[in-house]
Structure formats: C-alpha cells, structure tokens
Amino acid sequence: MITIKIFLGYDHQGVKCKDDIINYLNEFGYIVKTPDIINNDNDDYPDYAKWVCEHVLKEHSLGILVCGSGIGMSIAANKFKGIRCARVVDSNDAFTAKNHNGANVIAFSANIPTEEIHNIIDNFIMTKEPSEERHLRRIEKINKIREDIGHDHVQ
C-alpha cells in the first residue's frame, strides 16, 4: 500500500480548520505535512501557498490550501509551473478540478462547513487523474500557453 503525503497550508483564517483536516486525513492513513510557520493576524497567505507548492512539486504529491476565501491562495499557487490549483466550494468542484483539470492542489474557504470540507477532501484525493482525451488535450493547451508566453507575461 502506497501512503499518500498531503501538504496542508493555512493562514490565520484557515488555522481554525487545521486540526480537523489533519485528524480526518490521518484517520484514513494519509501523512499530512504542514509548514513550520507560526500563524498570526499579520501572516501572508502567499507564504503558505509557496511552501505547499514547492513540496507538492518536489514530492509529486497533493496540496490543500485554506484561507478566508481560497481565492488568494489559489492565485499564489498558480504562479508555480507544474501546479494546477483550483479554488473549490463543494465536493463537485473538487471532483471536476482533479478529473477534468488535473488539479494537484485545491484551495477553499475556512468558512465551509466541516462535513463539506471532508467531502471536498475525499473527492479531491480519491478522484482519478484525467484520462479522457479531451481533458488531456485541454491541459496540454494550458501548459503550452505557459511555455509560449511565459508564466508572468504582462502586456
């Protein structure tokens, strides 16, 4: 049995979900890694997104980001080549993010109810990577855009 390592990042708003997410994932045998950064009201979500994305890329694993809305974390995460982060609001989004778009990181609001957070996590982890030609073609087109214009291209 292969043990999946999940990298979890959370800012001062997401920290309220931290223990529940860790316990939930540990219950199913997943290894959860978190940054050695102390959360406070002045912390900056890009620091957590950076830590998670660097580890996801290095270890070919999955990442979960939690903040007030999930928006800032997803924007920061998508600056990394090789990261496909989706902001999700429910378990259907988590399924589509992984199965259609090949997401390796998800971001969501700390204000989502606990039961739905569990459903989101389940769908994200258990859903298979894209296999249909149309999804693979679209992911390749996204990758090509990055190569053609550069990730930080500004007009």
PLM region spans:
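N-terminal beta1-alpha1 ligand-phosphate binding loop
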Residues: 5-24
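A short beta-strand-loop structural module common to alpha/beta enzyme folds
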Residues: 31-43
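C-terminal binding/interaction regions
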Residues: 9, 13-15, 91-155
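Short, conserved beta-strand edge motifs with alternating hydrophobic and charged residues
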Residues: 9, 33-36, 63-67
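Short, structured coil segments at secondary-structure junctions
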Residues: 28, 80-81, 101
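Short helix-loop-beta junction
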Residues: 23-32
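Helix-adjacent hinge/juxtasegments
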Residues: 48-87
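Short amphipathic alpha-helical segments
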Residues: 19-22, 75-79, 119
